[in-house]
Each structure stands twice: as structure tokens, then as C-alpha cells.
Amino acid sequence: MNPATDLLKGLLSKLNSNKVCVGIIKSAKIDLSFFGFGVVIEGMSPITDEETAIIAILEKMKKNGKRLLITIDEVTNNEFMQVFAGSFQIFVRQDLPVFLLATGLYENIDELQNEKNLTFLYRASKIQLKPLNNRAIMNKYKTIFNII
């Protein structure tokens, strides 16, 4: 997902366009008509905020034995990312089947986790990678493409 855009809205849109999730949304009778997709379910109130809608979908996914991996490339400390991280903390606290794989510069991730309401990120598992070895990449390309 793109951290320069509204991540919760983007996640909800991606869930609604995924074949597996659409089936879950329909079977759970989750009314997403407020967001411009889905159908109105008779007798059901539409969900009017993204976080609540995502929680409802994740709860149904959990009942169906499904899990969700969210990937974010180039994490930055902006309002969209802060709101998403706060919501992600709620998803995890509610033991929902959601996982996050985020990449970015150390400085950007450090700045984000230093936000006073996002310090839970310090406790999250992290794997710090070293820079790629240019010579190894070059040799691999030579091997793959039979370059002498």
C-alpha cells in the first residue's frame, strides 16, 4: 500500500475488490454502501467508518480461518501512516488475523515509532536488513542472462 494515501480507505477498497474477501463481506452481510461499494442490506445499518468496517471484515475472516498480510513500501511518518498504525494496534489488540510487513528507511520508521501514541511499534518484531551487495546482484544477472 502507498503510505502517501489514506491507508484505511485504501485497505478497505482492496478488501472489497478481493474475490475471497467479497464473499466474506457478502456472507457476513457487512453493509459498505456508505463507502460507495457493496449493496444495501435490508434492515442493516451501513457501517460509516473505515476502521469499524475493516474490523468487521477481519472478524469474519478469523471465523473462516483466513489471515491478512498488509504490505507497505517506504513507510514515512505522516498523518495517514499514524492513523493506520493506531488502527493496526487496535486490530492486533483484538487478536484479529492481520499482519504487517513494512519497509522503509530506518530514520522514517524510527520517527514513526517515536510518536507518543505509537510506541507499541517498539515491541513489534523487526528485521533490519543490510544493503544489497551490488557485486552479487551483478553476478546473478550475468548467470541468469548468460552474459560473459
Predicted regions and their residues:
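Sensor-1/coupling segment of RecA-like P-loop NTPase cores
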Residues: K62-N64, L68-T71, N77-V83, S87-L118
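Conserved nucleotide-binding/hydrolysis micro-motifs of P-loop NTPases
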Residues: N2-P3, N77, L105-D110, L132-I137
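Generic structural signal for well-ordered alpha-helical scaffold segments
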Residues: I55-E59, Q89, K142
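Conserved small helical "lid"/interfacial subdomain of P-loop NTPases
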Residues: L129-I148
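A short helix-turn-beta junction within AAA+ P-loop NTPase domains corresponding to the substrate/partner-engaging
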Residues: N114-L132
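P-loop NTPase nucleotide-binding core
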Residues: M1-I70, V75, P97-V98
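Proline-centered turn/helix-capping motifs that create local helix->coil transitions or kinks
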Residues: V20-G23, Q113-N114, I137, I148
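Alpha-helical scaffold elements adjacent to nucleotide-binding pockets in ATP/GTP-utilizing enzyme cores
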Residues: P3-K14, V83-S87, E111, F120, ...
